[in-house]
């Protein structure tokens, strides 16, 4: 006997009622893409569980990949046997013996998804527990706080035995909540915002504002690397690189310095919204955290938002910087974000940006610029790169 399956448990998907089948199909598709480099695996989906038949594939690399797939609450290594009482007893004993069990406590937690199984759940718990005790030494029962909790799930197609959970990424399968555009800078915050947006089922496309020669090719590459890392959680991502130099310089020439940052943010949002329309997105995601910097006061957000009616999603709005950094380190974007290359938001930062801007004033200042024409020209020159998981970056160019 050996572990031959991985059992996947759904999270919030279990509450989706009539839409559950759509969520399960999407999760299965995302898992299949994530595990495409393991050709021997077989994925079997049911209403409340998903099972991966290993076919002798080493399980731990598979589990590591699955932990990056949104929509999975937890997963476990499992042994599948026939739904025959003696077979279940033997498999349960084998499972317990995989642990250093002497001096430990255990519990049997049986569940009969197949109600035609000939004995009750309580009887099954008793039969299995007794069999384990008779065939081991130094093992005792503790039904409240066991060291080993052996779970036995009897189903029509067979019985699955598991003993410990590996936490999943949680959330909803990417693609079940529509598409949004992520405003992706080279900083710490926006990749985390993209990660959290994908966790809620959003498919994302990234928009980055590039201002050569003030920002370097290495700064551009940093953003490509960040987007590439995010593909490991959400699959293929299209990265739209916006040539922003001309428009940015015009803003800083014509708009008073203390309003220049607000004017720039409004222009960036308008451009992102135009790209969203072309790509059939439903929302825009930003890495803003309330009060973190001058452009992220509530008054500034209101004035910037005024240029669009598109929903602006801010997953980090109530987080402290330390919380954001902790997530960035956990998901593998922090070490990329801290590379010392400036982005367009930092090269022309005013000395005293307005923290409580007036909408009437910024509208008046914008009249000195042919903004509609410049935005249209900028959108027409956007460069788009398609990034896929597990793809070496040198193959993109």
From Swiss-Prot:
One of its GO terms (biological process) is thiamine biosynthetic process. One of its GO terms (molecular function) is tRNA-uracil-4 sulfurtransferase activity. The keyword Glycosyltransferase does not apply. Its EC number is 2.8.1.4. It holds the Pfam family ThiI_fer. Pathway: Cofactor biosynthesis; thiamine diphosphate biosynthesis. ATP binds at residues 183-184, 208-209, 265, 287, 296. The keyword ATP-binding applies. It is found in: Cytoplasm. This is Probable tRNA sulfurtransferase. It comes from Anoxybacillus flavithermus (strain DSM 21510 / WK1). The gene is thiI.
């Amino acid at each position: 006997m050996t572990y031959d399956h991985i059992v996947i448990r759904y999270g919030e998907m279990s509450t989706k009622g009539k839409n559950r089948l759509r969520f399960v199909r999407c999760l299965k598709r995302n898992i299949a893409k994530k595990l495409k480099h393991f050709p021997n695996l077989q994925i079997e989906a049911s209403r409340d569980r998903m099972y991966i038949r290993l076919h002798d594939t080493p399980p731990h690399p598979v589990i590591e990949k699955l932990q990056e797939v949104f929509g999975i609450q937890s997963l476990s290594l499992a042994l599948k046997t026939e739904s025959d009482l003696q077979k279940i007893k033997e498999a349960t004993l084998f499972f317990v013996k995989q642990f250093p069990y002497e001096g430990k406590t255990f519990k049997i937690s049986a569940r009969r998804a197949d109600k035609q199984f000939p004995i009750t759940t309580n009887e099954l718990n008793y039969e299995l527990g007794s069999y384990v005790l008779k065939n081991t030494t130094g093992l005792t029962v503790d039904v409240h706080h066991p060291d080993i909790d052996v779970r036995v799930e009897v189903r029509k197609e067979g019985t699955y035995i598991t003993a410990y959970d590996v936490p999943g990424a949680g959330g909803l399968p990417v693609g079940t909540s529509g598409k949004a555009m992520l405003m992706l800078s080279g900083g710490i915050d926006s990749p985390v915002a993209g990660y959290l947006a994908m966790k809620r089922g959003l498919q994302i496309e990234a928009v980055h504002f590039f201002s050569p020669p003030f920002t370097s090719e290495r700064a551009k590459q940093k953003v490509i690397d960040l987007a590439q890392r995010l593909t490991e959680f959400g699959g293929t991502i299209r990265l739209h690189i916006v040539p922003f130099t001309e428009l940015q310089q015009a803003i800083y020439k014509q708009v008073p310095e203390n309003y220049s940052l607000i004017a720039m943010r409004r222009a960036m949002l308008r451009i992102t919204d135009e790209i969203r329309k072309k790509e059939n997105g439903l929302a825009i995601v930003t890495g803003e955290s309330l009060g973190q910097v001058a452009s992220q006061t509530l008054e500034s957000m209101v004035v910037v938002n005024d240029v669009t009616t598109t929903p602006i999603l801010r997953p980090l709005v109530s987080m402290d910087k330390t919380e954001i950094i902790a997530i960035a380190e956990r998901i593998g974007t922090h070490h990329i974000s801290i590379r010392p290359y400036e982005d367009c938001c930092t090269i022309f930062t005013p000395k005293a940006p307005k923290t409580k801007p007036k909408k009437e004033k910024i509208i008046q200042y914008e009249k000195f610029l042919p903004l509609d024409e410049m935005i249209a020209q900028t959108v027409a020159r956007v460069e788009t790169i398609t990034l896929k998981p597990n793809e070496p970056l040198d193959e993109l160019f």
